[in-house]
Amino acid sequence: MTLAHRMGQSANCVSRFAAGLLAALAASAALAAAPGAAHAEQAAPAPAATPIPRAEGAGPPLWVVRDADSTVYLFGTVHVLRPGTAWGSDKVDAAFASASDIWVEVADQDDQAVVMPVIQQHGVDPSRPLSSILSTEEFAAFDKVAQANGASGAALDAYRPWLAAFMISMSGPTNAGYRSEAGVDKTLMDRARAQGKALHGFETADVQVRLIAGMSEEAQVAYLNNYVRNADGIVANLDATVAAWLKGDAAEAGRLNRVNTRDIHQDIHRAALIDRNADWTNQIEAMMQGSGTAFVAVGAAHLMDQDSVIDMLTARGFKVERL
């Protein structure tokens, strides 16, 4: 696979999978707007979306915040899934149908013309190759994992540590059948377009990538080395996270996510989750000051982990109810 092809894959995945494992990076994801400025798209009608297979039991959790004239539903997504994963539910369908506005992390995530330049600008730096940042032992371990996934340390040497980490983190799941096209975000965005709903992004691809790329080099290297050390367990961790999410086990899904963020380095937790959650909470609070019904679909880690959007809304006096 060529480096250009891998960059194209990165653009697709970074914009969808930013918070969950990059965490999400996803990471995860332009306008001349200040960080946190929302981007809205009046969704053009699209072909009718394929029905979502029904989850067993209650399915993934859904929350709601209400006042006299405003309703905001909060649904935690998984950015990549195996095709055919059964995650649908009547409660999510009803909430989605009732909303006039759909909010996702990044509304322009499918626009390669937007995402690719962002990745190239903030994810590639030939003047400071990985081989000059990592120790000899670290680079050798990285090269071994890269080769096991069809690349090499030399081919990825110009990548900044955060992007190299992301490539490692996604190679295993991709080989195991996970696809961003089957992810919840893509599915719900397609449905929004099919139904002519207004589609909004909490951030732009440029903002999302800048937040991750802006982590300290120390944190980026820790992030990369973590995925190299645990390469054999990446798919198992994602499988377990998806299983917990499908059962509605928010606590377990949050715990598993922390393995890839806060447990590695606090800077990762802050960049991937805390700072973004605070900005999104501000935007949701603004929605509550208006009127109408909105459906928010963001990476599950933003709703299920510590320092979550739900925690922040609760701290501001909002009653967040799980349905």
Label each residue range with its predicted role.
Residues A23, S70, S98, G290-G292:
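Short glycine/proline-enriched coil/turn segments at helix->beta-strand junctions
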Residues T50-P53, P61-A272:
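Structured, acidic catalytic/metal-binding patches in enzyme active sites
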Residues L3-L25:
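Bacterial N-terminal signal peptides that target proteins for export
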Residues Q266-L323:
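A cross-kingdom marker for long, charged
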Residues L25-A29, A33, A107:
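Residue-level signal for alpha-helical transmembrane segments in multi-pass membrane proteins
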Residues A58, G88, V184-D185, N277-W280, ...:
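Amphipathic coiled-coil/heptad-repeat helices and related helical stalk/stem segments
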Residues A30-A46:
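Signal peptide processing junction and immediate N-terminal pro/mature segment
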Residues E56, R66, M288-G290:
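Extracellular/periplasmic catalytic domains that process cell-envelope and extracellular macromolecules
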